[in-house]
């Protein structure tokens, strides 16, 4: 049996001494400031002594087994103590330092969900086209960053599932565009303070997904319509495979509020206007390509109104006998749906409000970005949207339920980040 070392040479006793001195100082301050009373301090002291004594006994048991085991174990503890000392030294020299720990319990929970997601990615949905990242990718990913899709998986899925997914163009030569319209300052409504957080986070996400972002702020409904028409006419869409349209503003059931909106004189961009500008008749460069609408806005509380889409312009085309016959006999004309490949994801259900919390931005945009970063490497778009909805499933103090609407997508849309 190896002989026990003296207290002066054993790292355990040094660490116990350091811990005791530190805890004594902390407890003195807690009692002095009336944070703890005598009974509470006694209980904590007993617990601390128990931990320290058990740690000593554990090391002594190792020492009794073999001297080598004791050296290994004590060495690890000594190294930990050295790192702790170095951390405190750096803090004293350089001032407060940011320690790399999860910022909240929810962030730690997200990390656990991330790991579970990577293990069980292929079990989520029968219709889901599965991608499984290699173990190295999973273990090397940094929390709160966009997870990338492995190149070999991208090529495999793109080839084997070509008939089930929307075509994804190669990076080289691809000119994806996204539009963000954010109204922050209003003439008659409250300003949307701290909306810059949502803008920056959404812009960063879209750029990381390969989109060049066009940002427009503080527009009337007419100005928004003009910007949409100009964006729809951009030549880059011809060499693009998709687009995102993001709206962040006040809103009512009928649509997005412009900066001059008031009850007596509404200034509203209607959904039908957006869909009409980008439909297959008016925006041919995006025909058969996914068009994703993200809307962060309240949807009003008015009664007697329902959320509908009009069929203006379609009925005539379908019932005009001469036009139909002309299409049949003219080989240069093919029949096409007026509106396809759209999906709208809105921050709340009709008639209900959408919450924005201080400097952290809106709940909906925050959750949306978080789910994109976690899941778009292996899930298709609609599945990601359901992940966002699931995060709102249990009502909290701030209750809302994002809704997926006006879906005319005929295939799965994968973003394949990194490709």
Curated annotation (Swiss-Prot):
Any one Gene Ontology BP term: endoplasmic reticulum unfolded protein response
Gene3D superfamilies in UniProt: 3.40.50.1460, Caspase-like, Death Domain, Fas
Keyword Protease appears in the UniProt entry: yes
Entry's Gene Ontology cellular component terms: endoplasmic reticulum
Entry's EC annotation: 3.4.22.-
Function of the molecule: Involved in the activation cascade of caspases responsible for apoptosis execution.
UniProt protein name: Caspase-12
Organism of origin: Mus musculus
